[in-house]
């Protein structure tokens, strides 16, 4: 890295565990691009605006945005893409000649591994846990790409979740969305697809290992279980799903899917996706 190297970074809080630097630096090096990707941990939301103003002044190339700032960054950007405007959440920022443009590549990144199940999801009920930026992307993905009967959004505080969603979404668009209390988790049994859009299950976290009590035998072989957590590769939720013969989707698929689009937005090049996947999987297997 030298003075002519263009810098890209992940904006988040306590995200040193992230594999985004490995993904993007592998791709930059493979294509011979003079770019470097790093992590910027921002301690509190009040500092996000300062960070983005500094990035503009320093000429940084762009950012990935993760927990908990996907919505926090929105007011500080100069422009939003259509899909980011729709859900008022951003996970990718491009610095285009001093103009910071926000995108949401989570929507298609989330949807991509589900396209193989499109027929199975037609007319189905879906269980979605989480109410942050990742959950917003999932809700919008179902609106754009799939035809479920109903999406059940499980929330610890239903009223708070509804208020949060209303601040980001035009809720009248989502006629099949129902917000239900977390205490109704037994309804998971009736769902075809179960999604974890929370950090629960992430390696090193002390706040629980799964979105539902795994000893409750709610999962069955007809389920498709999608965990957005990617470290560990096989989370406690996915382990429980595999044990009963359910189909599983690993979080690494969404991670790489959204990163692939961000890479193209930053560089105009196509990411060498298979090389990236092999590199990340090899790293995860070392742990």
Swiss-Prot record:
InterPro entries xrefs: Aminoacid_DH-like_N_sf, NAD(P)-bd_dom_sf, SDH_C, Shikimate_DH, Shikimate_DH-bd_N, Shikimate_DH_fam
UniProt binding sites for shikimate: 18-20, 66, 91, 106, 230
GO CC, alphabetical: cytosol
Alphabetic keyword roster: Amino-acid biosynthesis, Aromatic amino acid biosynthesis, NADP, Oxidoreductase
Catalytic activity reported: shikimate + NADP(+) = 3-dehydroshikimate + NADPH + H(+)
Residues annotated to bind NADP(+): 82, 130-134, 228, 251
Catalytic residues (positions): 70 (proton acceptor)
CDD domains in alphabetical order: NAD_bind_Shikimate_DH
Gene Ontology biological process terms in this record: amino acid biosynthetic process; aromatic amino acid family biosynthetic process; chorismate biosynthetic process; shikimate metabolic process
Pathway where it operates: Metabolic intermediate biosynthesis; chorismate biosynthesis; chorismate from D-erythrose 4-phosphate and phosphoenolpyruvate: step 4/7
GO-annotated molecular function: NADP binding; shikimate 3-dehydrogenase (NADP+) activity
Enzyme Commission identifier(s): 1.1.1.25
Role according to the record: Involved in the biosynthesis of the chorismate, which leads to the biosynthesis of aromatic amino acids. Catalyzes the reversible NADPH linked reduction of 3-dehydroshikimate (DHSA) to yield shikimate (SA).
HAMAP family: Shikimate_DH_AroE
Subunit structure: Homodimer.
Recorded family membership: Belongs to the shikimate dehydrogenase family.
Protein name: Shikimate dehydrogenase (NADP(+))
Source organism per UniProt: Chlorobium chlorochromatii (strain CaD3)
Encoding gene per record: aroE
């Amino acid at each position: 890295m030298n003075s002519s190297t263009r810098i890209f970074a992940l904006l988040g809080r306590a995200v040193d565990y992230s594999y985004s630097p490995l993904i993007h630096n592998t791709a930059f090096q493979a294509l011979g691009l003079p770019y470097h990707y790093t992590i910027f941990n921002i301690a509190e939301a009040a500092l996000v605006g300062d960070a983005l103003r500094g990035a503009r002044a320093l000429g940084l190339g762009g950012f990935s945005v993760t927990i908990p700032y996907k919505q926090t960054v929105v007011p500080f950007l100069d422009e939003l893409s259509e899909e980011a405007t729709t859900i008022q959440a951003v996970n990718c920022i491009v610095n285009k000649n001093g103009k910071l443009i926000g995108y949401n590549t989570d929507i298609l990144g989330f949807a991509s591994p589900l396209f193989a199940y499109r027929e199975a999801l037609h007319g189905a009920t879906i269980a979605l846990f989480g109410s942050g930026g990742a959950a917003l992307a999932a809700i919008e993905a179902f609106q754009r790409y799939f035809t479920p009967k109903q999406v059940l959004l499980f929330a610890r505080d239903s009223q708070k979740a509804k208020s949060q969603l209303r601040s980001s979404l035009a809720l009248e668009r989502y006629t099949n969305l129902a917000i239900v209390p977390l205490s109704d988790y037994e309804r998971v049994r009736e769902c075809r697809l179960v999604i974890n859009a929370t950090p629960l299950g992430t390696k090193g976290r002390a706040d629980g290992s799964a979105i539902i009590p795994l000893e409750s035998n709610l999962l069955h072989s007809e389920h498709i279980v999608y965990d957005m957590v990617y470290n560990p590769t096989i989370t406690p939720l996915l382990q429980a799903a595999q044990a009963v013969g359910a189909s599983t989707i690993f979080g690494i698929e969404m991670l790489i899917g959204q990163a692939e689009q961000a890479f193209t937005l930053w560089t105009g090049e196509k990411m060498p996706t298979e090389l990236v996947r092999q590199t990340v999987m090899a790293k995860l297997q070392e742990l």
